[in-house]
């Protein structure tokens, strides 16, 4: 998810700091209105904090990106990631990629939901560069962690736990 756009700005700045703005971009997916009804039914524990993810509209996040001078390397897509990710990858001509020809060095999953995470991983997998990273950002283990572990097992990928952390 994109939420307020903090990671869009962070990754946008990293793209620029490393001089990759001619070849790389950040793409983000979010409903901008909390979890979908389907997600809430599948993951009832998400309902308690659903209001926390209704903090900014897509336009507000884009304004934040332009205010932080990264709007030119950021694209945001609104809707259910399970639907939007495969559609965008197959059909959308991005700022730095052609439809159905994108290649990614990093996929950063921050959605807290198993189905959104696993469906996004399945959609991005054919577009990953060799030795690409799949990273999750989950404060309380749940859907993302489970999706990553299931996906890694299905595809015989190694899961790295940085430092002395006991979770992926």
Predicted regions and their residues:
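S-adenosylmethionine/decaboxylated-SAM
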Residues: 2-168
């Amino acid at each position: 998810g994109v939420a307020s756009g903090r990671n869009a700005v962070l990754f946008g700045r990293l793209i620029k700091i490393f001089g990759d703005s001619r070849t790389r971009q950040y793409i983000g997916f979010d409903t901008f209105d909390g979890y979908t009804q389907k997600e809430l039914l599948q993951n009832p524990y998400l309902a308690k904090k659903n209001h926390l993810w209704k903090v900014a509209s897509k336009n507000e996040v884009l304004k934040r990106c332009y205010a932080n001078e990264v709007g030119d390397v950021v694209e945001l897509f609104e809707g259910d990631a399970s639907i939007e990710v495969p559609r965008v990858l197959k059909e959308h001509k991005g700022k730095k990629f052609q439809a159905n020809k994108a290649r990614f060095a990093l996929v950063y999953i921050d959605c807290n939901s198993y189905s959104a995470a696993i469906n996004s991983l399945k959609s991005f997998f054919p577009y990953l560069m060799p030795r690409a990273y799949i990273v999750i950002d989950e404060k309380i283990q749940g859907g993302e962690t489970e999706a990553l572990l299931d996906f890694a097992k299905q595809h015989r990928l190694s899961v790295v736990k940085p430092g002395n952390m006991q979770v992926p």
